[in-house]
Amino acid sequence: DLTAPCISSSQVIRTAKLLTVIAEHLGKSEDVKAYSEDIKRISNGLQKYAWDDEAGYYSYVIHDETGEAKEQLRSESGENMNKTMDGIYPLIAGITTDEQTGRILSHLKSEDEMMSKVGISAVNMKAGYYATNGYWNGNVWFSHQWFVWKTMLDIGEADFAYKIAKVALDSWKREVEYSYYTFEMLSITTGRGGWFHNFGGLSAPVNIWASAYFKAGTFNLGFDSFCENYSFENDFTHFSADVSHYNGKDSIMLVVMNDKNNYVVTVDGEKAVFNERSKGTFEIKLPSDKKRVKIEIQLV
């Protein structure tokens, strides 16, 4: 097939970024160089050939017989054929400009386009090729939403991250209470699950989200932040962590404490910027200008 999606290249970039951090910690400078070159080369290809400024999505790219990029995949009417979850994946790779990020977020957040009542649609609901009876098309896949959720922590979109998790938890709860099945996906039209009835890809992200916001002793970061070490008190009334932060953005760290108490939050000993999403659940801003920070949460 001569048509390339965005998700494969984007996941290679994201994986290479993770490996770069590990290689840096291990002192593997040659590996860091190799990964960095791959990231740059693939990122340049996506930006040069795949971005469609009119649509605000990255495109499927058709290649010629020699493997050279030829054109973006479009319908007979000229509509971009990748107004889909695939078309937003370079955001997850962390390679989008601020303008591209804004365009993609506008699609993801729009209840007319991708943010359905049961989660993020795999296909833009306003696209000419959106269908309600497909397998990928017309449905919500939690595994891909997990990647979007992590990315929202990376770029400081705490409110939207919570909305993704909360809508997914509520949708999953309704289906499981009715059928006691964990289907592959949820239908946007009916809100019901479909296809294989014991699918771990649906239930695993749900467990992560439930813990991320409601289970004391849990913390989460985006893809571009890494916890060097951490400690919780046994009763979850004190937390400390050393965090490395690589993307130069105001990212978010989620920490869930014992919800029976009040706390003070500091970053490098200074009062932190944070939001208490619910009692004991903290969304802490990691300053964009610091690569390494000390996070501490303690009783007032």
Task: List each language-model region with its residue ranges.
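Inter-helical turn/loop segments and adjacent helix faces that build the functional surface
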Residues: 19-36, 152-155
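Surface-exposed beta-strand/loop patches in extracellular or lumenal glycoproteins
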Residues: 244-261
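Generic long, charged, amphipathic alpha-helical segments
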Residues: 116-141
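C-terminal beta-strand-rich structural cap/linker in extracellular carbohydrate-active enzymes
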Residues: 276-300
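Short strand-turn-strand beta-turns centered on an Asx-Gly dipeptide
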Residues: 266-270
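C-terminal capping/lid segments that line or modulate ligand- or cofactor-binding pockets
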Residues: 57-63, 68-107, 134-236, 245
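Active-site acid/base region of carbohydrate-active enzymes
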Residues: 1-6, 37-41, 47-59, 103-124, ...
